[in-house]
Amino acid sequence: MEGSSSAIARKTWELENNILPVEPTDSASDSIFHYDDASQAKIQQEKPWASDPNYFKRVHISALALLKMVVHARSGGTIEIMGLMQGKTEGDTIIVMDAFALPVEGTETRVNAQSDAYEYMVEYSQTSKLAGRLENVVGWYHSHPGYGCWLSGIDVSTQMLNQQYQEPFLAVVIDPTRTVSAGKVEIGAFRTYPEGHKISDDHVSEYQTIPLNKIEDFGVHCKQYYSLDITYFKSSLDSHLLDLLWNKYWVNTLSSSPLLGNGDYVAGQISDLAEKLEQAESQLANSRYGGIAPAGHQRRKEDEPQLAKITRDSAKITVEQVHGLMSQVIKDILFNSARQSKKSADDSSDPEPMITS
């Protein structure tokens, strides 16, 4: 029973995050893990990304690396964490095959790597090569607990510095709080543009919910980087390691509830939504009664998408709560209905008491 429940939980996680096995599903599929030193050196010499800021368009992440990053991010709670990713490049795709955590000091809004973290980084990379893992560091990951996957001003500066000296380099952001609330991994992969690079004003990034106290930081820097498409894969080499990791953590999938574990996060979302509504109402009132008519008309047109975004945020909160309730109902039916049915059957099989006049 335990083995089947573990397998079902892991299969559900793989389906929700669209983790696909490498085809064909035999030892030949593990060729993706083969590191060709000559081809990687050739790419480093050619540097195709130097002439095209949007050269890299896709990220291919192994299921093992994804699970390690999510577990690490979740272990930090409301404190930001940081780690590095190892892999290689293949055309316009960055392939992430493994990840490791860094000993860093984090807060609820930023994470800082000190000298001991850099020493650990160098030592880990050297030891990996001695163990036969020739992949280089291809990026860094960190968490944004509860406020979405995007790059802050500090993140943009860090990524620009890394791209200047360690190309090819990738930035991945994971939101562990929204991951628990939504039921699938909330993740984003980004690369920054060179300093001074201009993009068109009609460039629109995918909409996501940003807390009111983070909107300014998001808006100032949102045109300094672009996002990459993320896909996941697993091979026969991953299967055993995934089993070992999953056997340790799968019980949490069934025993935890986003409604209980994320209560503070949901309360914060509702409070943030109320502040956004008050702000929109204030701006709408000013546009109606303040200034001359054309200016007021222009501001009113700008308010419409803001209200639409607030509606989206409200719908997102509602859907996540409904999903949480549905999962609780399903678990109740799965684990309690059989016990209740057995109890009812036992009660009906008891002999009826004799009635004497």
Swiss-Prot record:
Transmembrane segments: none annotated. Ubiquitously expressed. Highly expressed in flowers and roots. Expressed at lower level in seedlings and siliques. Its cofactor is a divalent metal cation. Keywords: Acetylation, Cytoplasm, Developmental protein, Hydrolase, Metal-binding, Metalloprotease, Nucleus, Phytochrome signaling pathway, Protease, Signalosome, Zinc. A motif (JAMM motif) lies at residues 142-155. Changing residue 175 to E/N: No effect on CSN complex integrity but impaired CUL1 derubylation. GO terms for cellular component: COP9 signalosome; cytoplasm. It is found in: Cytoplasm; Nucleus. The modification N-acetylmethionine is found at residue 1. Residues 59-196 form the MPN domain. GO terms for biological process: COP9 signalosome assembly; negative regulation of photomorphogenesis; positive regulation of G2/M transition of mitotic cell cycle; protein deneddylation; proteolysis; red, far-red light phototransduction; regulation of defense response; response to auxin. Its EC number is 3.4.-.-. It is an enzyme of class 3 (hydrolase). Disruption phenotype: Short hypocotyl and open cotyledons in dark-grown seedling, accumulation of anthocyanin and expression of light-induced genes in the dark resulting from an impaired cullin deneddylation. Severe developmental defects resulting in dwarf stature and loss of apical dominance. Csn5a and csn5b double mutants are lethal at the seedling stage. Pfam families: CSN5_C (PF18323), JAB (PF01398). Residues 338-357 are annotated as: Disordered. The JAMM motif is essential for the protease activity of the CSN complex resulting in deneddylation of cullins. It constitutes the catalytic center of the complex. Component of the CSN complex, probably composed of CSN1, CSN2, CSN3, CSN4, CSN5 (CSN5A or CSN5B), CSN6 (CSN6A or CSN6B), CSN7 and CSN8. CSN5A or CSN5B are present within distinct CSN complexes each containing only one copy of CSN5. Interacts with itself. In the complex, it is located in the center and probably interacts directly with CSN4 and CSN6A or CSN6B. Present also in subcomplex forms which inculdes CSN3. Also exists as monomeric form. Interacts with CYT1 in vitro, but not in planta. Probable protease subunit of the COP9 signalosome complex (CSN), a complex involved in various cellular and developmental processes such as photomorphogenesis and auxin and jasmonate responses. The CSN complex is an essential regulator of the ubiquitin (Ubl) conjugation pathway by mediating the deneddylation of the cullin subunits of the SCF-type E3 ligase complexes, leading to decrease the Ubl ligase activity of SCF. In the complex, it probably acts as the catalytic center that mediates the cleavage of Nedd8 from cullins. This is COP9 signalosome complex subunit 5a.
